[in-house]
Amino acid sequence: MQKLAELYRGKAKTVYTTEDPDLLILTFRNDTSALDGQRIEQFDRKGMINNNFNYFIMTKLAEAGIPTQIVRLLSDNEMLVKKLAMVPVECVVRNRAAGSLVKRLGVEEGLVLDPPLFDLFLKNDAMHDPMINESYCTTFGWVSEPHLARMKQLTYQANDVLSKIFDDAGLILVDFKLEFGLFNGEIVLGDEFSPDGSRLWDKTTLDKMDKDRFRQNLGGVIEAYEEVAKRIGVTLD
């Protein structure tokens, strides 16, 4: 599949068109960002790790009946995907308190959330991805009520699948975000799942094994990503 024009360049991925109008090439770069892209550093192997990590997770979710945009791996850092009309809303599930929830409510980090919380955020870096609710989505026309309900259902289903995968690997899935789009009128899971967009803690030590290591200057970012990948069975080079 030939890579043509650059369609979109995000904080850590670049999207290219192909000769097929329904297919895109997703390229994972070594960039790592924080503070809505204000702080950016590069880490060797990160693009390769996240590409293979994402393919592994998306394959597991597809096997569980969740429609995803993946088609196939093209290289260490490239993947062929379906072209989705992306919904500008992020879905977040929180199994434990961390990040913005702790800051907003003053609850203890690590507090078990049962049942898990479901949050929505508008994708807008300039506005720091503001938290919204379901009525905002329909009133402003970001996504229809039926499609939003489907996104919520698939996010919870993904949480069930992924929580078990990580638990079996000695890890806690603290929280994560998912993004969806439309393909032929149907809601499909897009973007990525990796330690960039999730929080993963070691079950025994509670060590952070995700991008919080970068955000909080803990060091060992790539080592943590590789360890998580190894534990769940992701094949790296």
Curated annotation (Swiss-Prot):
One GO MF term: phosphoribosylaminoimidazolesuccinocarboxamide synthase activity
InterPro entries in the cross-refs: SAICAR_synt/ADE2_N, SAICAR_synt_PurC, SAICAR_synth, SAICAR_synthetase, SAICAR_synthetase_CS
Pfam families: SAICAR_synt
A Gene Ontology term for the protein's cellular component: cytosol
SUPFAM superfamilies: SAICAR synthase-like
Pathway: Purine metabolism; IMP biosynthesis via de novo pathway; 5-amino-1-(5-phospho-D-ribosyl)imidazole-4-carboxamide from 5-amino-1-(5-phospho-D-ribosyl)imidazole-4-carboxylate: step 1/2
Catalytic activity of the protein: 5-amino-1-(5-phospho-D-ribosyl)imidazole-4-carboxylate + L-aspartate + ATP = (2S)-2-[5-amino-1-(5-phospho-beta-D-ribosyl)imidazole-4-carboxamido]succinate + ADP + phosphate + 2 H(+)
The EC number(s) this enzyme carries: 6.3.2.6
Biological processes annotated in GO: 'de novo' IMP biosynthetic process; cobalamin biosynthetic process
Keywords: ATP-binding, Ligase, Nucleotide-binding, Purine biosynthesis
Family: Belongs to the SAICAR synthetase family.
NCBIfam families noted in UniProt: purC
Protein name: Phosphoribosylaminoimidazole-succinocarboxamide synthase
